[in-house]
């Protein structure tokens, strides 16, 4: 694989700020469906690995929810910029792991970057609304808050597009 930035192809799990193997040390092969060549291996995570990741995410969320909208926007903008800086490598990795034509992979990643751009701007607008009530002398006030840690399943067909839309929401 001819990547400009080899550090983008890490064959480990990212849990609590660290790249790790599965506790079982078991792996599975990543196969390019277009030619059946082995692209790499990934840790075969168990329930224990998943629970560890969820616990770490909950701790991180406690910090994330305390950030201002502007501070969140800065993080999301940085992610957006990293996507754009690495679009060629990300597209190559996507093409090799799921067999999409390279132009389709670049298109999907570009489209996904539009979501990170949009969410970076929306993060600044975390204010709520005041809504008129049907009862005299009353107001309805809404607020926007982080929901918390969510489990997501991404389809093989649109892995990069699903990530920013579900991760940020």
What are the functions of these language-model segments?
Residues 159-165:
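Conserved small/polar residues in nucleotide/adenosyl-binding loops
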Residues 37-126, 137:
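Glycine-rich loop-to-alpha-helix module at the N-terminal edge of alpha/beta enzyme cores
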Residues 1-41, 74, 78, 128-154:
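Terminal low-complexity tails and localization/encapsulation signals of metabolic enzymes
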């Amino acid at each position: 694989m001819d990547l400009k930035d080899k550090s983008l192809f890490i064959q480990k799990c990212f849990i609590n700020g660290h790249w790790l193997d599965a506790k079982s040390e078991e792996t599975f092969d990543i196969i390019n469906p277009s030619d059946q060549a082995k692209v790499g291996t990934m840790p075969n995570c168990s329930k224990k690995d998943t629970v560890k990741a969820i616990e770490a995410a909950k701790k991180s969320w406690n910090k994330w929810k305390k950030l201002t909208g502007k501070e969140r926007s800065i993080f999301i903008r940085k992610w957006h910029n990293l996507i754009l800086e690495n679009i060629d490598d990300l597209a190559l990795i996507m093409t090799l792991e799921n067999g999409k034509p390279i132009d389709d992979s670049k298109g999907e990643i570009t489209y996904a970057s539009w979501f990170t751009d949009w969410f970076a701007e929306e993060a600044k607008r975390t204010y709520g609304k005041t809504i008129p009530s049907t009862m005299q002398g009353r107001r309805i006030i809404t607020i926007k808050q982080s929901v918390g840690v969510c489990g997501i399943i991404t389809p093989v067909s649109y892995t990069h597009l699903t990530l920013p839309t579900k991760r940020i929401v």
